[in-house]
Amino acid sequence: MRVLLTRAISDIKDSMNKLSSLGHIPIAEPLFKIKPRPFSLPDKNFTALIVTSAHAFDFISDEFFVRIKDLPFYCVGSRSSDIIVRHLPHAHIICAYTSSELLSLIKKDVNRHEFLYLCGYIRKKDIEHQLQPHITALETYDSEAVDTLSTQCVELIKKQKIECILHYSQRSAETFVRLAEKAGLTSHLSYIHHIAISENAAQPLKSFPTSIARQPTEQCLFEVLQSLRPS
């Protein structure tokens, strides 16, 4: 199947390799550019660290990792935990599939920690709102949406050459739908099967045929894709 990937450019290569190994034809359509933001570690005695996106580590120096090496890490997703282990093999990591699951785990410890939250400039504020006053946000990156879909993407959709689109977040799904409308492609999206990594990611896709992964992981996203293959 020809599968459109809407991930950030820094994430897309690994996903394309996995799709190719499964016998699909991956087509890259990165919707975001990940850029650094100026930051420094606040002068405060933090006792735990929160990460909800692996991109929070994209511009972290080795020196920064050394300064936070003794903190327990609360994180979302295997990519985040893999990065932590790569830099700090003996780190104490508490990992969850989603931010809401992570928040449930954090709330058990909230009164005994002062949290440093490594995050992006654009983010949902649920964690910050619910953990006040025990949390300080440190913005380490920005994810800037592109202005238009690529010419290749537009032409492939118009010619019905795309059979499936993978959506990795609510924001990426919203961005794709908006850019597709801008390119005059809205009616064409009904001929494509969409797969969302979560119910939240599926929200902007209600007008189109959409399946949702059973868990918010790329592996489960690919499981849905495999189930759609012609027998």
Task: Locate the predicted segments by residue.
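Signature of uroporphyrinogen-III synthase
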Residues: M1-S231
